[in-house]
Every structure is written in C-alpha cells, then in structure tokens.
Design a protein with these regions (language model features):
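Short, acidic/polar
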Residues: 2-17, 187-193
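Conserved alpha/beta catalytic core and glycan-binding cleft of carbohydrate-active enzymes
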Residues: 19, 32-35, 40-206, 211
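Active-site groove signature of glycoside hydrolases
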Residues: 8-34
Length: 214
C-alpha cells in the first residue's frame, strides 16, 4: 500500500540522510490494524520493516495501545520492536506511594513482568520500562502534586490524565518545608533506582535526573 511505502521511505530518509538511529511510534499498535480496523498478527508495515536491510539496525520503540482501545503489550506483532510497559509505570508509582496490595506487582515488574509474558521474564529489549514520559507529570511533579494543574494553557484543566498515582507528601506543589523536601528527594531516588535496576530497557525522561517540573 502507498501508506506503507511512504512510511518506509520516510524512515530511510531520516536514517540514511540525517543520521537518525531510532524511531518511536506513538499509538503504534494502530499500525497493526487492517481492513475495517481489524487487528492483524502479521501487519504488512512491520513485516516490511523487518525485511528492509537499510532499517535492520535501527532502534524501534512503540506504544502498544491506540485511541480505539487496542492494547497489545505481551503479543505485540513485531518482536524486534520494544514496547512501552505502562504496567511498569503504574505498578512502581503505586508501590512507592504506599498503596495496599502493591508489593506483588513490584516484584513482577522487577523480574521482567513474567505475569504479562506467559509466566516468563520478558526477552531483553521487548519491555521499555518507564516511570514518566513526555505526557503528564515529570518525576518531580509526581512527588509534589496529588492532582494535575494544567491551568496556563487555557484548557481549564480539562486536558491530561486525571489518574496519575501521584502523591504530594503532605503539601500540594512547591514547599519550603525541609522534611517534605527530603522525603520528595528520597522518593525520586527510589523511583529512579527501581527503573534502572529492573529487568528491561529503562527509559528516562530528560530532566528527571535534575528535578525538572513542567
């Protein structure tokens, strides 16, 4: 199809002419839909990517969900494409926030999420683990706010996710309280350590290492 050809030629241009060494597909599982939006197990685009020698060395990452409700983490139809593990994000946030019944989930995520991959630890490169991303709270915001505050963009706080598994540690927003500051810094280190030590590929949001807020 012409759309597949356009995507492949665009990737080759970015990779060969401009030196880009990897691509991320936002809502990428949508690319696996066929006629009448039916999910395919062997999508032509992913098959063509795998067979293209000029794209074989690129790093490929995808979101395993789309706007139509399709979610295929454990059976994403392209084994060489790493997939964002949203269960890792949610499980780690809940554990370090102190939610009940979150310890078992923490253990599963540390071991490579075998509960999501037929009882086996995920193959290296398949699970892209993350705590934060470009959407939503940064790491510093995650430990500083119980709710979103998207007021400056004129959307009246209607945009963005409402369910963030965040915890402000007693004070909403910036605080000069030394005890709150100490606890927030500790929690950021806990979350970062969990990300870096768990089995899988860690994805670190730029700026989280220095406490950036947005």
């Amino acid at each position: 199809p012409i759309s597949t050809q356009l995507i492949l030629e665009s990737m080759r241009c970015w990779a060969l002419e401009l030196g880009v060494d990897g691509f991320r597909f936002d809502l990428g599982i949508a690319l696996s839909r066929g006629n009448q939006l039916k999910p395919l197990n062997d999508p032509p685009l992913f098959t063509a990517m795998g067979a293209d020698p000029q794209l074989s060395d690129l790093k490929l990452v995808s979101e395993p969900w789309d706007c139509g409700g399709l979610y295929r983490l454990e059976d994403f139809p392209a084994k060489r494409i790493g997939t964002w593990n949203g269960h890792f994000r949610d499980g780690m946030r809940r554990f370090w926030k102190g939610d009940d019944h979150s310890t078992w989930t923490l253990a599963q995520r540390f071991k490579g999420s075998p509960d999501l991959y037929d009882g086996k630890p995920v193959a290296l490169g398949r699970s892209v683990n993350f705590i934060t991303a470009h959407d939503g709270f940064t790491l510093a915001d995650l430990v500083s706010y119980n709710r979103k505050h998207n007021l400056a963009n004129g959307e009246d706080n209607r945009d963005g996710e409402n369910h963030n598994n965040s915890w402000n540690h007693g004070i909403e927003g910036p605080s000069s309280n030394p005890l709150v500051q100490t606890l927030r810094r500790r929690q950021q280190r806990n979350l970062l350590s969990s990300l870096l030590l768990a089995r899988g590929v860690p994805m670190l949001l730029m700026g989280d290492e220095v406490g950036r807020s947005q």
